[in-house]
């Protein structure tokens, strides 16, 4: 299983990161004689521009040239952000639109991350693992291979306090929709967590747990294969 960053390493990364407030500015007006700072990315025509820049850099620019602009629209979706979204260019996985994956998360080969899923810094999505819609992997939460994390499920994150142990999900585990796995819990290989379960203690390999708090109700070997099948075709990428 891939090793994740320690809590102390994540805290240091966030502390040292240059905080960013990126904005996108749409402009109509007269741009004659305008000099753009090197930090600006500028696109457009003689009458209209789109500028990508930091909010702090925009203010003095606007003070200098604002009288030349007729229409202004500014988009801002974060403030003093420390952690950017992950660059997925070289990620060999299926990532659907609307997934939020932060830098320093690890997405292994053949994984699937569905719409609305959130993968926080230091989390690990194992090879062939599916993170379903609106599921959340908190900081340092780690899954093994061929895991299914159901829609709306939560694997609790542990960055603060830094002494807490992360959630560990071993290979071939099925986690039902809206289940919650609390910090420090380890779910053993081949186990099944029922939908809506609140898991507060370690789950033995091959066990089925359900309820609030979750308790062992039977063994995964007693569950029909069709109800616990991991479908390889859903993880297939282009040939």
UniProtKB/Swiss-Prot annotation:
GO biological process, one term: lysine biosynthetic process via diaminopimelate
Annotated InterPro entries: DapH, DapH_N, Hexapep, Hexapep_transf_CS, Trans_hexapeptide_repeat, Trimer_LpxA-like_sf
UniProt-listed Pfam families: DapH_N (PF08503), Hexapep (PF00132), Hexapep_2 (PF14602)
EC assignment: 2.3.1.89
Pathway participation: Amino-acid biosynthesis; L-lysine biosynthesis via DAP pathway; LL-2,6-diaminopimelate from (S)-tetrahydrodipicolinate (acetylase route): step 1/3
Catalysed reactions, as listed in the record: (S)-2,3,4,5-tetrahydrodipicolinate + acetyl-CoA + H2O = L-2-acetamido-6-oxoheptanedioate + CoA
Origin species: Staphylococcus aureus (strain Mu50 / ATCC 700699)
Top EC class, one word: transferase
Transmembrane spans: none
Record-stated family: Belongs to the transferase hexapeptide repeat family. DapH subfamily.
UniProt superkingdom: Bacteria
HAMAP family: DapH
Name of the molecule in the record: 2,3,4,5-tetrahydropyridine-2,6-dicarboxylate N-acetyltransferase
Keywords: Acyltransferase, Amino-acid biosynthesis, Diaminopimelate biosynthesis, Lysine biosynthesis, Repeat, Transferase
Gene that specifies this protein: dapH
Function noted in UniProt: Catalyzes the transfer of an acetyl group from acetyl-CoA to tetrahydrodipicolinate.
Signal peptide stretch: none
SUPFAM superfamilies attached to this UniProt entry: Trimeric LpxA-like enzymes (SSF51161)
MF terms in GO: tetrahydrodipicolinate N-acetyltransferase activity
């Amino acid at each position: 299983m891939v090793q994740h960053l320690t809590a102390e390493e994540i805290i240091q990364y966030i502390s040292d990161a240059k905080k960013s407030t990126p904005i996108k500015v749409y402009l109509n007006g007269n741009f004659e004689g305008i000099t753009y700072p090197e930090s600006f990315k500028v696109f457009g025509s003689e009458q209209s521009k789109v500028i990508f820049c930091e909010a702090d850099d925009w203010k003095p620019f606007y003070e200098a040239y604002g009288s030349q602009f007729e229409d202004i629209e500014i988009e801002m979706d974060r403030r003093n952000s420390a952690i950017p979204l992950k660059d997925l260019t070289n990620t060999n996985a299926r990532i659907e639109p609307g997934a939020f994956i932060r830098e320093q998360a690890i997405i292994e080969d053949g994984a699937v991350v569905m719409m609305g899923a959130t993968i926080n810094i230091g989390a690990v999505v194992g090879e062939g693992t599916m993170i379903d819609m609106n599921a959340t992997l908190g900081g340092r939460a780690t899954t093994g291979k061929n895991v299914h994390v159901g829609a709306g499920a939560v694997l609790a994150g542990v960055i603060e306090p830094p002494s807490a142990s992360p959630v560990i999900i071993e290979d071939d585990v099925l986690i039902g929709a809206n289940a919650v796995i609390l910090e420090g819990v380890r779910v053993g290989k081949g186990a099944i967590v029922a939908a809506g379960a609140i898991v507060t203690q370690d789950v033995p390999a091959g066990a089925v747990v359900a309820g609030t708090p979750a308790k062992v109700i039977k063994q995964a070997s007693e569950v029909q294969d069709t109800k616990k099948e991991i479908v390889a075709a859903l993880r297939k990428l282009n040939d």
